[in-house]
Amino acid sequence: MRSKLFVPGSRPELFGKALNSHADAISIDLEDSVVTERKADARSFVSLFLQSNEVLASSKIIIVRVNGLDTPHFAGDVESVAHARLAMLNLPKVESADDILAAVAVLERAEAQAGIDTPIRLLANVESPKGLRFANEIAAAHPRVAGLQLGFIDLFEPLGIDRYDKANVHAVMLAVRMAAGAAGVFAYDGAFPDVQDVGGFRAEAAMARRLGFLGKSCIHPRQIEFANDVFTQEWDVAYASRVLSAYEEAKARGAGAFLLDGRMIDAPGVRRAQAVLAASKGTALSGE
């Protein structure tokens, strides 16, 4: 999931275009991009889209960001979008393990009502000081948690922190990546607001990639190709293939560690190579 294109839930005319884009995933939003008066309409639009033939025929990863647990819209959102083709439910402003457990309870009821057998996973947004503080607990709260996603604007702006300062961004990225890594789930980079600043987008995506993030959110179609490019580096893919080939040879010899280009590689390096190859194919939902 190198790239994930954001689509407002109140704009159904954009759903099909997003589905046919080069993004590995689409994230339809019912939260901030939809005004209160259009919440019900957006919910219906998304529900119908998830049941459409074009979605059923597509292999695109589909995510829906619902309204927060502390809003009157949450339960209705979950009940409306709980469909078999929904890969993940994106939870905004998660601040504790209890938030995850509360969301799971609502989701389980919705799945039972809809007759869904395969559990829908959760992508938890870290976008508040409290959420950042408890990121470890959030990531490990329940097996449904697939990953942690950064929300820089909600995290930084209320505190007067410069969202474009690379040191600020790096510090939060590293903390969230470590929390995700400890729980064995992926970390996903947030949106870059300036759609005209290609260099800034690429630089931030490259920073996330170096920290082991799975991919980056895109708020405009023009950002997709840059996210895909940054998170699919040919040298990395080729090297990952060599790592796995060398691993198979070492395994046949009964060795758990081996040398490649003078560098010792063991189980963590093999897992990283597997993740790189999965991400290059746009199939990964796990960063470990």
Residue ranges of model-derived segments:
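Expand to "…catalyze enediolate/carbanion chemistry for C-C bond making/breaking, isomerization
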Residues: 1-288
